[in-house]
Amino acid sequence: KLACRFPDFIDYVESVCNEFRELYQNIKGTTPYCIKRVAVLNSWGKMRAWGAHMVHHAIYQKQNYSYAGVIEALSGAPFDVSFISFDDIRRDSGLLKNIDVIINAGDGDTAHTGGDVWEDEVVSSATRQFVYEGGGLIGIGEPAGHQYQGHYIQLANVFGIEKETGFTLNYDKYNWEAAGGHFITEDCTKEIDFGEGKKNMYALEGATILVQKEKEVQMAVNEFGKGRSVYISGLPYSFENTRILYRSILWSTH
């Protein structure tokens, strides 16, 4: 009934559908070339594929747009994207052998990043092993964020970053210098837009800071065993941020 009041909208939908019919007719079931296999890891997996960060018909939310851009960027990229849950890893951690890069994005202690699921040694050890043996890990916001056993970022040694929650104020922190240039940021022509970003993030020894603002890390990279990780405080959708994510995936899988 609502759509009938907007005939131009109906006509446009028809034209778009016809475009897709033509595409399907021409590709004849061919799988497009994908350069890497990327898995978005959260509590829902396939249940909320492509919609994990969508709230109320994708209406803009200040708390959400810094993460929704990640899914938007992946949707048009030359990657084989899948969505896996923590329960999937519990059932069969071997599935990670068919993945090149894991992305964990969102605020800490939420279903997006896992919360107390990281207390489960099966999940945490499988993820660490994946990276140590050569996999890539990209964290956006507060990946694996949950206060437990002296850490807030439960994969702190993998990402090379930690969040100051008051428990490490008396720790000396010396790693604040940002690197001059990096493969990931080569396409950037202006200051990187981190959206809301994150406060109180600091780098651990050995990590390479790409961007920091007032001694708060916004982007960093780290090597863990044979693998690599990338940390980004937020990534709202834009052309340049799409390139950042694209190059982050390539760099993390080297």
Give the ranges of each region predicted by the language model.
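A glycine-rich, often tryptophan-bearing local segment used as a flexible ligand/cofactor-contacting loop or short
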Residues: 109, 114-190, 241
